[in-house]
From Swiss-Prot:
Induction profile: Strongly induced by high salinity. Slightly up-regulated by drought, abscisic acid (ABA) and jasmonic acid. Not induced by cold treatment.
An example Gene Ontology CC term for this record: nucleus
Record-linked SUPFAM superfamilies: NAC domain
Domain of life: Eukaryota
InterPro entries membership: NAC-dom, NAC_dom_sf
Assigned keywords, A-Z: DNA-binding, Nucleus, Transcription, Transcription regulation
Protein name as annotated: NAC domain-containing protein 55
Ranges for domain NAC: 14-162
Length: 317
């Protein structure tokens, strides 16, 4: 059985809410100067690796601590045996300096230099730029060994990945949308969903009342379903004062028959002075004698029963 690999962060036993956000001066004085002098740290937060052997996206897994930025102590090699230029080749690409070096001072004394670098994939000078950034901290007077290939025994590096402009814009849009929703979006959205739910339930009630089974060939298509409206009070009282639009059923090449159930109400309909009484809803077909000028209207009486009156058009009022 192999040894179980321990989580470096779990071994640190850090208190809840601990954060590591040192300033440039603290990194230089409290960490790099002490590391170069051979001092040990009671709490190891910065890993020791040869940073230039890895691609930057591999480095977070080798850090001891950090979520969005990671810190490392690393040696820095010479590009040429007797030269003073550092070797910037790393992994599948290279680090390229950008911007102006910043001098770090403490108590009026200069102690180090901060340099910013960007990682490029490929070979210089035609590499592809990435969003990986390094801040390299080095001492002004490093300890150098004659004949050594190392330019510095230790430099301190901060690694992080910069957000693109598109990522920043997406984040800003998300935050703006969240604020708008919290201010007025929730009430508007809630009302809209309630209105949709009411209409959907009314369509289901209408199908059940007319005896349509789910998936039945006699079920009215959506475009031929009665349209419930209330021009007075919005959607309050929809169930009490329905208005059905049956105009689309007239003149169709194929009009579905309306199936009857034993509980369907009685409806009176007629033409002019002639009225007829029938039990249930009339059946319509292509040879129907009912024209667009004929019609009937229903008014609820005695609970479930209906009595009709002549209407100017064809449809429920």
């Amino acid at each position: 059985m192999g040894l179980q690999e321990l989580d470096p962060l779990a071994q640190l036993s850090l208190p809840p809410g601990f954060r590591f956000y040192p300033t440039d001066e603290e990194l230089m004085v409290e960490y790099l100067c002490r590391k170069a002098a051979g001092h040990d740290f009671s709490l190891q937060l910065i890993a020791e690796i040869d940073l230039y052997k890895f691609d930057p996206w591999v480095l977070p897994s080798k850090a001891l601590f950090g979520e969005k930025e990671w810190y490392f102590f690393s040696p820095r090699d010479r590009k040429y045996p007797n030269g003073s230029r550092p070797n910037r080749v790393a992994g599948s690409g290279y680090w390229k300096a950008t911007g102006t070096d910043k001098v770090i001072s403490t108590e009026g004394r200069r102690v180090g230099i901060k340099k910013a670098l960007v990682f490029y994939i490929g070979k210089a000078p035609k590499g592809t730029k990435t969003n990986w950034i390094m801040h390299e901290y080095r001492l002004i007077e490093p300890s150098r060994r004659n004949g050594s290939t190392k330019l510095d025994d230790w430099v301190l590096c901060r690694i992080y990945k910069k957000q693109t402009s598109a990522q920043k814009q997406a984040y800003n849009n998300l935050m703006t949308s969240g604020r708008e929703y919290s201010n007025n979006g929730s009430s508007t959205s809630s009302s809209s969903h309630q209105y949709d739910d009411v209409l959907e339930s009314l369509h289901e009630i209408d199908n059940r009342s007319l005896g349509f089974a789910a998936g039945s060939s006699n079920a009215l298509p959506h475009s031929h379903r009665p349209v419930l409206t209330n021009h007075k009070t919005g959607f309050q009282g929809l169930a009490r004062e329905p208005s059905f639009d049956w105009a689309n059923l007239i003149g169709q090449n194929s009009v579905p028959e309306l199936g009857l159930s034993h509980n369907v109400p009685s409806i009176r309909y007629g033409d002019g002075g002639t009225q007829q009484q029938t039990e249930g809803i009339p059946r319509f077909n292509n040879n129907s004698d009912v024209s667009a000028n004929q019609g009937f209207s229903v008014d609820p009486v005695n609970g479930f029963g209906y009595s009709g009156q002549q209407s100017s058009g064809f449809g429920f009022i």
